[in-house]
Design a protein with these regions (language model features):
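Electropositive phosphate-/nucleotide-binding environments in soluble metabolic enzymes
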Residues: 2-6, 22-26, 64, 101, ...
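Internal active-site segments that recognize and position negatively charged phosphoryl groups
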Residues: 182
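Divalent metal-dependent catalytic cores for phosphoryl transfer on phosphate-bearing substrates
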Residues: 41-147
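Acidic/His-rich, divalent-metal-binding segments that scaffold phosphate/diphosphate chemistry
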Residues: 1-62
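C-terminal binding/interaction regions
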Residues: 137, 143-172, 176, 185-188
Length: 188
């Protein structure tokens, strides 16, 4: 089964209660839908959004089994195997050996950590917004390994490489995606 966004959101809330995790899921969902449209997958935008929404389904309850436990949960809920594979693949090289294959999986892999880093940069700005955020501001913070240390630069760079994009292109496109995502508002 491929759930609607509302059904996916309900499943997400069964396993996640922390506002930070819920906001992150909504941001990644919006970013995924944006990239679906930008990359010519308009007809799959809702599917990409569902994958983004559910990608960290197990993280709050089972952080040590991240991308492993969610496969069990999703299969038990009857979710389509494409969702199971896509969400698990964002843990490639970290917790699972499921490699991102489809463009959608590569986008998720590349942008998951990056949205966190961009969000952290935005929160440091007086505007607390991605609307006036520039590539150079993100790159400056990106170079500081202590800034948003939980956001793996290695994963971000590997994701850009998987997509055949430069790091600058990935960051710039993700900033644009976050500007188009209502959940990526930090100034409210």
């Amino acid at each position: 089964m491929i759930p609607t966004l509302d059904e996916a959101r309900a499943l997400l809330k069964e396993y996640n209660a922390e506002p930070f995790h819920l906001k992150h899921a909504e941001i990644v969902s919006g970013v995924m839908a944006y990239f679906a449209r930008e990359l010519g997958y308009e007809d799959e935008a809702d599917f990409w959004a569902v994958v983004g929404l559910l990608h960290d389904l197990d993280f709050e309850r089972y952080p040590e089994e991240h991308c492993i436990k969610e496969q069990e949960i999703m299969r038990a809920a009857g979710l389509d195997e494409a969702i199971v594979h896509a969400t698990a693949s964002h843990g490639y090289g970290l917790t699972v050996d499921i490699k991102p294959e489809h463009t959608m999986e590569k986008v998720l892999y590349a942008t998951d950590e990056l949205t966190g880093l961009i969000g952290a940069v935005a929160l440091m700005r007086p505007s607390k917004s991605v609307d006036d955020l520039e590539l150079k501001s993100v790159k400056k913070k990106y170079k500081n390994a202590n800034f948003a240390a939980g956001c793996s630069r290695e994963v971000i760079e590997r994701g850009a490489e998987m997509l055949g994009w430069s790091l600058d292109d990935l960051i710039s496109k993700t900033i644009l995606a976050m500007r188009a995502t209502p959940a990526a508002r930090f100034d409210d």
